[in-house]
């Protein structure tokens, strides 16, 4: 199977659920290329209920903001806001750049940002604004063949650092840092060159660790990259990664970096302690090697969501599938905690809340 077919096959599966140092990957983008288009259409309350009808293709992402509000990004039906009592749905009709939502983050000014198939949307709690990223032109016949798998305009990951910078991971144009005025390009030439001799680096996950380093995952055979504010360090299989197609990264409370992969080769769950990498495989009890979501609970257990696999918990010694009244939970794409220590998880099959004793399904099928 060639790389194009592999990427496309991988993305279709998603839709159904839905050490080298360098600083030459960093480029400042001109101020005049930054444009904003404010959407003035009114925000209408579309759903008022303590449960919501599940979109046809489920959900991609979840986020808890500073007000305690939960946001859920869907596969094709916009974003859902939950205030603890009711859901409200926002779509392109309300100003979103796209109904396909991949990532959500909040900035220090209380704005909520959405990574979509058509770029960035900013919501100031009143109106949506489309923020144009000054992408380098990478148009080619190759992109037409693999769209929407590799799509430079799509924003698949978002993070905010301690300085307030917004970090943006695209599905084919590397990463960008946005300081509120200017965009700076990073890692556009990492990974494997494609048929058109361009890299089209796809970054599905970005985090900041406890030391303030920014970590980037690459799904186009670029491994992981760590940026300390001055230089990038790239980690590949030769450095200890179990695979170079990385799906998600997570920093736990102790500062360890946990890495989930696309499930190729002998990949599994890899942890970096600052000195070396260690990988847990299915032979070690790992429930599934296609890790899509990682979350640490208040008891330091790791919750692991997997594509084509069941929700799993790692207590530091053993892995076990999570179940409730005999029910397991498959294809979990996001996991997060709320202000009351409930754990929320979801994906193609809906959204659930676990209060420590009982699992409550927050979506209905009709």
Annotate each predicted stretch with a short phrase.
Residues 2-366:
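Carboxylate-rich, polar loop motifs that coordinate divalent cations or form catalytic acidic clusters
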């Amino acid at each position: 199977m060639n790389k194009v077919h592999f990427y496309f096959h991988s993305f279709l599966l998603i839709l159904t659920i839905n050490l080298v140092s360098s600083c030459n990957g960093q480029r400042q983008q001109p101020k005049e290329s930054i444009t904003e288009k404010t959407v003035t259409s009114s925000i209408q309350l579309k759903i008022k209920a303590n449960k919501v009808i599940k979109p046809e293709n489920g959900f991609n992402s979840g986020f808890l903001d500073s007000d305690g509000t939960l946001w859920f990004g869907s596969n094709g039906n916009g974003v859902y806001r939950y205030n603890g009592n009711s859901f409200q749905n926002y779509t392109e009709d309300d100003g979103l750049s796209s109904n396909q939502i991949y990532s959500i983050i909040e900035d220090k000014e209380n704005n909520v940002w959405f990574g979509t198939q058509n770029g960035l949307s900013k919501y100031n709690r009143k109106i949506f604004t489309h923020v144009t990223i000054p992408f380098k032109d990478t148009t080619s016949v190759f992109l037409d063949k693999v769209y929407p798998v590799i799509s430079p305009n799509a924003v698949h990951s978002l993070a905010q650092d301690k300085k307030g910078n917004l970090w943006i991971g695209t599905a084919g144009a590397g990463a960008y840092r946005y300081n509120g005025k200017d965009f700076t390009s990073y890692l556009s030439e990492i990974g494997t060159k494609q048929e058109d001799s361009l890299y089209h680096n796809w970054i599905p996950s970005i985090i900041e660790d406890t030391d303030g380093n920014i970590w980037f995952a690459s799904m186009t055979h670029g491994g992981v990259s760590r940026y300390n504010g001055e230089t990038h360090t790239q980690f590949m299989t030769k450095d200890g990664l179990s695979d170079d197609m990385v799906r998600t990264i997570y920093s736990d409370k102790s500062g360890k970096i946990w890495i989930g992969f696309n499930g190729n080769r002998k990949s599994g769950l890899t942890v970096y302690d600052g000195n070396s990498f260690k990988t847990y495989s299915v032979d070690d009890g790992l429930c599934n090697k296609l890790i899509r979501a990682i979350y640490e609970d208040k008891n330091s257990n790791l919750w692991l969501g997997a594509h084509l696999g069941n929700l799993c918990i790692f207590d530091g010694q053993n892995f076990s599938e999570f179940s409730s009244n005999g029910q397991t939970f498959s294809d979990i794409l996001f996991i997060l905690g709320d202000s009351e220590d409930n754990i929320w998880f979801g994906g193609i099959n809906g959204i659930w809340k676990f209060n420590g004793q009982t699992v409550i399904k927050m979506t209905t099928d009709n």
